[in-house]
Amino acid sequence: MNRPLRYCLSLVSSLLPLAAAAQLKSIPQEFAASTVVLTNGDTIRGSLVLHNDLDLLLVTMADGTVRTVPALAVRTFAVSGEVMRFDRLPPQYYNYVSTPPRMRRRWAQVQRARPFLVYPWDHDHDYATSTAPAFFERLNGGPVILLRRQRLVSRAMPWSDPSWVSGYTTRPVGMPTYYTDVRELLYLGTPQGSIVALRRPKRDVLAYFPAEAEQLEQFARQHNLDFNEGAHLARIVDYANSLRQMTASTQ
């Protein structure tokens, strides 16, 4: 084997572990303010770190103490002011310690309060025999509630990505640049306290509301709503709730 080919193979093999590790690196969400209502009736407030993969809260109180709160001990909580770092810059281009946090602009109205509820969850294992308390963000009113779980994942930016052709092509070979990807899972919270996974949101929502399915599709078309977008789907589920309530009131 000639020397250039050996060098190329060696370079590729050294980069593969880095790329693979970057695919599944989950990172917590940070919020500037929160109000957490515990199952014992107490209420705590402060900045909050949400570890979605662990269903765990870290709340920094006004006196600087940090409370670790598992989902089992939480009745409900609300957060506002999601904090992000400059996650589209590689470490060598800024001083992380001195760089002030900024509000995440991925979603509109970052400062609004975002309520969370706790439901028993089987982690989407169809044949699971047990569940555990887990956090779900509430996106609409009810009685059928649209729920969301978000996961922030650190991924490596491909070298071929056009976002990096200006100013960042000088980074050393083998040093990947990371960015934050947002994964979103949607569910329905039923009035009975269970949840329904929306693996294919349009199909599953229409299946849950069979009597209203035709009207829901018409409503979505009229208002240009996408069943796969959380904010859009919240409007559709609210409309489904109103249709059911109208039907119940006439019976």
Show where each model-derived region lies.
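Positively charged n-region of N-terminal signal peptides that target proteins for export
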Residues: 1-6
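Bacterial N-terminal signal peptides
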Residues: 8-17
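Boundary at the C-terminal end of the N-terminal hydrophobic targeting segment
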Residues: 20-26
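Short solvent-exposed loop/turn micro-motifs enriched in small/polar/acidic residues
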Residues: 27-29, 41, 179-181
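A short beta-strand micro-motif
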Residues: 33-39
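Short beta-strand-centered aromatic/proline hotspots
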Residues: 45-48
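Aromatic-patch recognition
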Residues: 50-199
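Long, compositionally biased interface segments
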Residues: 197-251
